Amino acid sequence: MALYFERVSTVVSACGPDARFLLEVIIAESEHRHEQWQDLSVKSLAKHLRLDEAVVSASLSELVDASVVERCVAPRNGLKGRGKVTYALCLGNDPELADRTYPQHAELLQALFSGADMVFAVLGSELGKAGELGKSRKSREFDEEAAIARPAKGKRQLLGSRGRLSIRNRLLFAVLLSRSDQFGEVQVGLPELAKLTGMQPEQVKTRLVRLMMLGLIRRHIPGLSSKVFAAGRIESSYFLNIDAVAPQGAIAVHITHDWEGKAYTHANVLRGDCKNARAGQLHGIEAPSSLLRLLMGQPGKVFFLFQYLLCRYASHLLSRHWQKLASDKPIEDAELRAWIERDFIKAPKPALASEIDPELKAGRSGEAASDLKDGAGGEAGQTCGCIYALAMEIAREYRVRFGQADWVDFEAEAADIRILPNMSDFGYRAITILFQPMLVGLGRFSVLREVSRGVVNIGSEASDAEFDLQRRLDFGLVCLPRKVRKALGLQ
């Protein structure tokens, strides 16, 4: 979904971020009022948005130069002095702007482009001195009492600093939000974000970190280029906090009783097998040879992205086959198989007839034209089959564990489920899902603690903010850059 300002070519090509934000506010406010904004002036806009008048004046001048807004000076009728200056949209009845409603995340987008004072707690500010948490707890094993954010005995809990969302951060968050799905997940590259916001890439990177620090980006999966993937380049993915203003969906966390047995993800195991195979240590390797050939020698960030893709595939299975996943019977999903092939098998390049060896023409007629990016060739189908099997294993793991809440009927209510990736070094000790709609028996935020094998109790937390920051990081509920985590003494 494009924001309003994106539909005006002169704004996208010539205006800076402040002017883009201002135009979106003017159009959105007009839609809210069901009429053109009357007496639109520098002073009224500055007051409405709590901005400096100089910023508003400069932005309106940009919009005037782009022929999007016209400057109107009221006649003085013989009186001395300058007439009152107001501004009006001059877009006319542009069909591109006829539909002025946000189809998704409307409440949050309307709040971003309004005079609402959007203030959020800065993550980590409650820790006091940097490194305080890291020094106080070396183990990450779950302890309910330690995990709840409560003041130490004899001390008052710090309120923590608050961060006000600037107009440029609002614009960036809105651009991300406008392209996200129902769960707030969006895949977009830095160059595209820079183009849409009118900012430089480095400025966008800095502001993305700010959004993370304010808890508005729950999870960031960095993009990368690798021959492993068919597209060659996978853009970054973000899970946005769509509940920042008002609850939109629901979250459930499952914490296992088998702490050591669930310490690794499928990608962790694959990476270990690849390292051992490369070193010639073949004993105990579980990964299929085709996957080893695909992933061997790849850096850790490729395995992290591979795990994210597996979780996307598993989310599809959980949403479509919840009941079937309860048994060990094979599940055939042609849509998922096609999805995996698109992600891992490159499309064939058309060759000129003169470039094809005549002796090979007949032999190629019945063969698949696509090859894996690593050149695995005829093993492409086998490799994709292995990836399909891994996704099925993950889906069944999540089905078993969340199915322990046997008072909840995911199938009957046709829940749409999305796995929220947790910390890469936390394994499956705690797993998190987003789901819509809300389900009977689970609140907006639910924590299932496995007290013994197969038996869970539901926690009393009303929101993820009741956990300390390390737990929220572990569960995938918030994310911070590595440097920030290190400075705060977090893992």
Predicted regions and their residues:
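Electrostatic interaction modules used in gene-expression and signaling proteins
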Residues: 10-17, 21, 35-38, 51, ...
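Positively charged, structured surface patches that bind polyanionic biopolymers
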Residues: 1-16, 32-33, 90-163
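Extended, helix-rich scaffolding/adaptor regions
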Residues: 31-34, 42
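Short glycine/serine- and small hydrophobic-enriched flexible loop segments
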Residues: 27-28, 178
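Intrinsically disordered, low-complexity N-terminal extensions of nucleic-acid-metabolism proteins
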Residues: 85, 96-98, 174
